[in-house]
């Protein structure tokens, strides 16, 4: 089934699932820059960027990008690109809430729910 998707997309998923968010972002960036109307890829890039901001403790930007990605992906529900978009949107909304909570209370150590992409 994976062979029906572009290799850049599959590389994005592999790298993202390995926690290599910057690399996953770059794997999809070239394809997206050729067709910026592809809001699905834009959302995935934002999702990876949100994780990068989380790792950098830029919680405001993490929350912002998690929400933006969730909003863009909602248009592709219930499934797209082999992904369960409904579940992914719910998880990203939770991630945004967690990032907001962490930003507002840096004394606590909040954890993001895991995001695993399965095609």
Predicted regions and their residues:
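Intrinsically disordered, low-complexity, charge-biased linker/tail regions
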Residues: 1-2, 9-10, 83-119
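TPR/TPR-like (Sel1-like) alpha-helical repeat modules
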Residues: 59-77
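Solenoid-like repeat scaffolds
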Residues: 32-37
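Boundary/linker segments of alpha-helical solenoid repeat arrays
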Residues: 38-41, 73-87
């Amino acid at each position: 089934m994976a062979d029906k998707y572009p290799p850049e997309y599959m590389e994005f998923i592999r790298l993202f699932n390995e926690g290599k968010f910057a690399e996953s972002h770059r794997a999809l960036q070239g394809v997206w820059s050729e067709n910026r109307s592809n809001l699905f890829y834009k959302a995935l890039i934002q999702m990876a960027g949100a994780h990068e901001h989380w790792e950098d403790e830029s919680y405001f930007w993490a929350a912002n990008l998690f929400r933006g990605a969730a909003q863009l992906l909602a248009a592709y529900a219930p499934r797209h690109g082999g992904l369960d978009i409904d579940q992914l949107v719910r998880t990203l909304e939770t991630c945004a809430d967690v990032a907001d909570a962490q930003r507002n209370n840096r004394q606590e150590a909040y954890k993001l729910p895991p995001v695993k992409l399965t095609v």
